[in-house]
Design a protein with these regions (language model features):
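Ligand-binding "clamshell"
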Residues: 61-66, 159-169
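Hydrophobic residues within well-ordered alpha-helices
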Residues: 95, 141-145, 160
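Flexible hinge/capping segments at coil-to-helix
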Residues: 63-74, 78-103, 118
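Paired acidic/hydrophobic, glycine-rich loop segments that form the ligand-binding mouth/hinge
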Residues: 52-55, 147-151
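Short beta-strand-to-loop elements that line the ligand-binding cleft
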Residues: 34-38, 123-134, 172
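C-terminal effector-binding regulatory domain of bacterial HTH transcription factors
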Residues: 31, 153-164, 172-206
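Central regulatory/effector-binding core of bacterial HTH transcription factors
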Residues: 2-65
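Ligand-binding cleft/hinge of the Venus flytrap
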Residues: 7, 25, 111-125, 157
């Protein structure tokens, strides 16, 4: 098996989870070349000639084919040092009193976090003194005790398991953050199918 695979993943998850698996896959298949494009935005698979995307959440484009890789959810969390100095929120509205570490919309310095409250969807506007378009930067700021983040639990599962980050608002449902392997239509390349199978086997939820 030989040839290229062009793929995309979110920046933080791509660095911490996907890149090491690429190393393992290429040890098994040294004639394959993998190009990994990291972006927290949505990449057009057809326009950018991408074979495979790892994406979170439900898919809006029905023309894309998706395979569920991991079930995930978004969580609100902060370091124990932050919670020691700031009362943990009991309701999403309480986030207005917290320094929220924001992954902004283009041209904005705030973000909107979504919850389900008493069966109704609720969107809460949050803001803080640190803004970044890189999930890894936001994660590190949270670990350093600078504020509260909302992240896919899959991206920070090691930090949650170790207690380096502690969740809040767990009784409020957040949006779907399942991880999917997405392709533009049917996958014709054997190497892409083999790589997706490899990821499905090795991206194991803790």
């Amino acid at each position: 098996m030989r040839g290229p695979i062009r793929m995309t993943a979110t920046q933080d998850f791509g660095r911490t989870e996907v890149a090491p698996l690429i190393d393992r896959f290429l040890d098994l298949h040294p004639a394959v070349q993998i190009a990994l494009h990291l972006s927290d935005g949505v990449v057009d698979l057809v326009e950018q000639d991408i074979d495979l995307a790892l994406r979170n959440g439900p898919l809006a484009d029905s023309a894309l084919k998706a395979r569920l890789m991991l079930r995930g959810r978004r969580v609100v969390c902060a370091a124990p040092s932050y919670w020691a100095n700031h009362a943990a929120p009991n309701h999403p509205d309480d986030l207005a009193a917290h320094n929220c570490l924001v992954h902004p919309r283009p041209g904005s310095t705030f973000s909107s976090w979504s919850f389900t409250v008493e069966g109704r969807p609720v969107t809460v506007r949050v803001a803080g003194n640190r803004v970044a378009n890189d999930g890894g930067v936001l994660r590190q700021w949270a670990l350093d005790g600078h504020g509260v983040i909302m992240r896919n639990a899959l991206d920070i599962r090691k930090e949650l398991a170790s207690g380096a980050l502690v969740t809040a608002l767990d009784t409020f449902v957040t949006s779907n953050a399942n991880l999917y392997a997405v392709t533009a239509g049917s996958v014709s390349s054997q190497r892409v199918r083999t790589f997706i199978d490899f990821l499905a086997k090795n991206l194991v939820a803790d």
